Amino acid sequence: MRAVLDPNVLISAVLSSTGAPAQVLSHWRAGAFDLVVSDRLLDELGRALRYPKLRSRITPAEAADLVRLLQAAGVVALDPPEPPRRSPDPGDDYLIALAEAERALLVSGDQHLLGLAAAFPIRSAAQFLDLLRPEPAR
């Protein structure tokens, strides 16, 4: 299975070690799925991790380490050129296009994107965890 994690999911995973986003990241580290990243996604993540409101929660070195880890261990894909407009926030369209181009599921905490789940393979971190967990034996 392949997944694109919205930068908001990655940031949530860093800020709280107990929530669904952190569990998703742990599953990736354990090899449960391939994490698809792109230069644009990594740039957005790096910028967001430097926001003043996050600096008290994550050091610049920790932020840089995370971006390097994702770049080194993730599946680095090319950013699709000029993604079509699909999301109420045009800044998120590249995530949908990246997931589609890489045949991956998009995992997001953004309600605008989650509202498009009927048309595109988009799930919340909790919903993605349900897909990763094996079904109990009957």
Residue ranges and their predicted role:
Residues Q71-L105, Q111:
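Active-site neighborhoods of divalent-metal-dependent phosphate/nucleic-acid chemistry enzymes
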Residues A13-V14, A48, R57, L116, ...:
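Residues that scaffold the ATP/ADP-binding catalytic core of kinase and kinase-like folds
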Residues G19, V36, I58-A61, R86-D93, ...:
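Residues at secondary-structure transition points
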Residues H27-E82:
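PIN-domain endoribonuclease scaffold, especially VapC-family toxins
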Residues D43-E44, P83-R86, F128-R133:
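A short acidic, often aromatic-flanked loop/helix-cap motif at beta-alpha or helix-coil junctions
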Residues M1-V37:
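Short, well-structured N-terminal submotif of metal-dependent ribonuclease cores
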Residues R103-V107, Q111-R138:
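Acidic, PIN/NYN-like endoribonuclease modules and their adjacent C-terminal/linker elements
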Residues N8, T18, D39, A64, ...:
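Alpha-helix N-cap/helix-start capping motif
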